[in-house]
Amino acid sequence: RLRGAGGGANLLLYAPIDTHLEGDESDTPWVGPKVTADLLPEAKMVDDWVFGLGSSNPKAMVATLAEVFRCVREANVPLLGDLSLGFADGGMPVTIPDRGHAGMSHGILHLLNRGGSPDFCIVMKPWNWVYHEEPGMAWFKLTVWGSLGYAGVPRGTPGFRSSIVPAARVILALENWLPAYTERNTSGVVRPDGWISALRSGWPERPAFPSAATEIFFDVRVNPRTSPAEVHAQVDDFLRGLLADDPELEMEWEMYGSTPGGSTPESNWIVQSARRAWEQVEGRPYPETPDLLGGQTDGSLLRALGVPTVRMGWPWPAEGAPEEVAEGLGGMGATYIPDLMPCAEKILWAVIDTCTRPRAEMLR
């Protein structure tokens, strides 16, 4: 924490520090058919590019915010308010039971509960916009039931029912329903998408015995104006409708993880300061409607807990990498350093704008 002279606001610069993958053999084959430079937990620099697992998200954010903090300190900016620098684990949308259920924003909650709660927060994450709100998420586990079978039993034998084949029908119905959910719940700058993300059934080492259960896991994003409980109700209505349409279908479901969305009023000081910074660096007016957002971050919880928060970023993903990178999301491990510089300037502008004036002026 860089302490000001007094009378100003406490501004937190924040980024998570965890990666979404382990960076070991447990990632394959789920990340793709081969391991590329962006998936490896090893740094590799090629000209102005940095490769390695998480080098873009979150490591580029951590490095950029640390440099902004250092610049303010070394320039002896006459701060009235305090400038805090905070990083925490648990920012990736995962939950890890064998690590004390790490994930789901547990790190930022720990930080806030132990004296780190600020007046305002700037979260650095990808995309070159200023977001005043972000979605939450709701995770569901759906189990389709059949009976334990045997490959030597003819189809139609009484007492033997597949769980996998009806689960396939459920998957297709769910895939058709999710876009309608998104359209129905889109508002503000948040587009809450949903994706089927994992399947589990039976034993690969026992292919002769079809499983009595097939589990379907999916993530549904939560608009700040919609609670996780409301999302659960919408999913519940849809799945009960499937049961009504197919009496032979046997399934159960639960929401096993959730975080709320969060929104800061657009009129709030930190939102307006960040937009002024964006306009100053970009040299053009901030657009009325940026690209709609579906990605969840710790910023959602910060806002839900009452901390006015804005998300700032840079163009992402970087284009023209000189190394091969994975298709799709990959390891979020390809960073082009010049892309980060305008974002650093915007955040620095907002820091000076916020921390050099009386707190009362910003909290009117």
Segment roles from a protein language model:
Residues G8-S84:
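Active-site metal-coordination/substrate-binding segment of hydrolases
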Residues Y14-P16, G86-F87, I122-K125, T143, ...:
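Short beta-strand segments
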Residues W49-G52, S56-W139:
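Acidic/histidine-rich catalytic neighborhood of metal-dependent amide-processing enzymes
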Residues G23-D48, V94-L112, E319-G331:
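Charged, glycine/proline-rich intrinsically disordered loops and linkers
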